[in-house]
């Protein structure tokens, strides 16, 4: 499942297990550049942190909040480290490649479920005191899919400490190469 500690060739869990990653961070005005080990939390890619060692990615991420009420993100991820591994590897679609559920070690154009180029970009606009924010996000998993996500979030303040939040999203994912990934999804949350 990619969630548990790895086992060695004897079926035993290693006696030590750890991971270390560094990130360069620079800030100019309301713009932030991060390069190195990243744990993104954006609509098109989200690092899993529900286990002892979190999933991490290696890449570059630029976040800009230079324009009032507008947040922009752009970046490229090239490698990933699963929660049950201490090794960087090509980014895998769902942690496994193909329908067989077997990990593949080589990244090739004929294996569209692995990539070293995951590009993302997105903007989110907060419409002032209206409680409404809208966003658009794009991702390109090189050789597998392109994804567009449009969302709207409305927050209704009930009192100073409570609010009701509605989130509506539409995602369209289209096949790139022969990945077999092609879908549309609508989701909502209250």
Question: Model-derived features: where do they sit?
Answer:
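Beta-barrel outer-membrane channel/assembly domains of diderm bacteria
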Residues: 1-40, 64-66
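A short, flexible beta-alpha/helix-coil linker loop
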Residues: 40-42, 173
